[in-house]
Amino acid sequence: MTSQASAPKIPQLWVPLPSGIHPSWREIDQGSAAWLDRFGLYSDHAQRERLTRISVGEITGRGGPDGRLAALQWTADFLMWLFAFDDEYCDEGPAAASPDATLLIITKLQRIVEVPWAAPADDNYSAALLELRLRLDDLTTPVQTARWAASFRAYLQGQIWMAANSTYGRIPTLSDHLAVRLDSSGVKIFSTLSEIIHGYDLPAADYDRHDVRGFVEVFAAIIGWSNDLVSYHKERRRSQDSYGNVVDLIAHERQCSVEEAVSETATMHTRAMALYLRLRDQILRDAEPELRKWITDCDSWIRADYDWSLTTHRYVNPDDPADLPVGSAEAPFRAREADQPLPIASVSWWWTLLKD
């Protein structure tokens, strides 16, 4: 559970994927700050400062280093919305511990995603999401919009589960938490953004493949577990008390120290990364150009999130610095264990996708 005790040292994580960034990322970042001000997605000046120092332009530019500028700006604005909403409704605001309040706002937001031309938008977050949803139609195909909308709805629905756990003091099992957090973390949405940024449709025959669906889960887990480690210091100080972080859940379920739980989380990350690389190569063997491009874009998002997370002011607060690593590890954490499946019911099936 989160507390005010000093946060543990976070080890370097193994992310053996290429790094890049769009040359216009600073301009994109400035555009998102102006967009944030347009809708006033903050409660006070201090919160505005925290949000504008996140550098959404950087993570977007890293995730789509050769993407279309208008689509990158939309993506950065959407990520700004996610960060603001996460702080206000999911982690720190009064709705974070109220499933009723969470359900009310989510019902409204889902309607905006589905039928923006007929949905009410009577608060800042609804109005901002409506603007994003209408802009999206000018940038995408119906297929791209539908995939983004499905992943976004899954993210919203996951917030109800998180709020209910917090309200009733319910501590989920690690297995249940890992399954729900694939969606509630919002990370799966990243797997839909590349088609928007680059303007291509991944064929349904590829998108709905059993191994590709599993690949998306591994992709989301890698980013989600990395975020849980890097954000641990911030969450200890700013979030509602809850078991929303994998580190705290491991410490509770294993009855171990936070430092031991950090080490186990890093080991989980390494095993997922090793599996990701093997699945990646397996899928690429017979991949058509769109699937090949999409896989490469997933690589970019994993590396983008990791590089950005080590320098963003969201986690690296100069006034209250976290003990974070520098760069990616050259070798897997606990290398001898890297290829071993995780003995966790909700995710162990990923390893059954390997053909050799």
From Swiss-Prot:
Q: Which reaction does it catalyse?
A: (2E,6E)-farnesyl diphosphate + H2O = (+)-(1(10)E,4E,6S,7R)-germacradien-6-ol + diphosphate
Q: Which cysteines are joined by disulfide bonds?
A: none
EC number(s) stated in the UniProt entry for this protein: 4.2.3.166
| Extent of motif DDXXXD motif | 86-91
> Molecular function (GO) terms listed?
metal ion binding; terpene synthase activity
Which GO annotations describe the biological process of this protein?
terpenoid biosynthetic process
The UniProt keyword set, sorted, is:
Lyase, Magnesium, Metal-binding
PANTHER family in the cross-refs: BETA-PINACENE SYNTHASE-RELATED (PTHR35201:SF4), TERPENE SYNTHASE (PTHR35201)
Q: What is known of its domains?
A: The Asp-Asp-Xaa-Xaa-Xaa-Asp (DDXXXD) motif is important for the catalytic activity, presumably through binding to Mg(2+).
List the protein's name.
(+)-(1(10)E,4E,6S,7R)-germacradien-6-ol synthase
> Native species of this protein?
Streptomyces pratensis (strain ATCC 33331 / IAF-45CD)
